[in-house]
């Protein structure tokens, strides 16, 4: 079951506009709301229209609504927005990215798409304001994952799985307040249900409500947040698991003897909708540029365990898994990850096989809590 199944009994109309990457429809029975492109790799993205959002929001004054607007930017092929706002030569690239001319050009295009998306968010909020329902509506803004640069999307580094979460609810949530509370995606549904007046105790959710954090009644939420990556069908199997307490991140690469290959990111032709022509420049420069070699090797050849003090090493470039001074921290996080995997029925590497992937596509999961 999904969001529509749980909010509909509380009287909510539940709609979705934009990108849809979930199926079958009977498991995710959102009302389709028109106006935003559903294809995240179209070049260019189709112009968006706001009439569908306005109609959905205002249609029934007696029934509340929940609307997901899944914007497709920023996403390869990074063609929307005005990249001239970000001169490539003036950019400061993060240390986990190789510094090549093509990378700078693509990073500028990526930033332009973020700016384009930010403008869309403003337009959506104006539609809400014009409906007269803004003061009674909780708005959550978050992202799916990190950027499509090596070491980000399709990884369990912080730059791959840690995204921002912004909330607005006039009169209920204090504007400008920040919190270090640790939450994860699984917590969003029970949070919405709790705020909508539902009883979250009657269902065994993977997450738990952080409504008290939003309302300023609590400063902390969960002890740990977890992540995983199974690489099939994006490339050869390369299962990864991670846990963070908000300050430290522990990563476990379950097949460290393998090299990591991601078929889209490493696309060489540069003409496909998911290919990244900058990757070829990383490979080209790795033989004579020590930093480029370092980030290419970091991406493709990973140790069994990684431990990062993320609070002081934002891009997680210093692996401290072998540091005896922080052995207790590694043991604590590793134990927490073990307990979570057991609770999820996660066997580890066997999950990332063609057989397990095909079974999941057919709804016949080989693993998990039965």
Question: Language-model segments: what does each one mean?
Answer:
Residues 1-306, 314-342, 346-349, 361-370:
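Formylglycine-dependent sulfatase
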Residues 353-358:
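A glycine-rich phosphate-binding loop feature that marks nucleotide/adenosyl-phosphate handling sites
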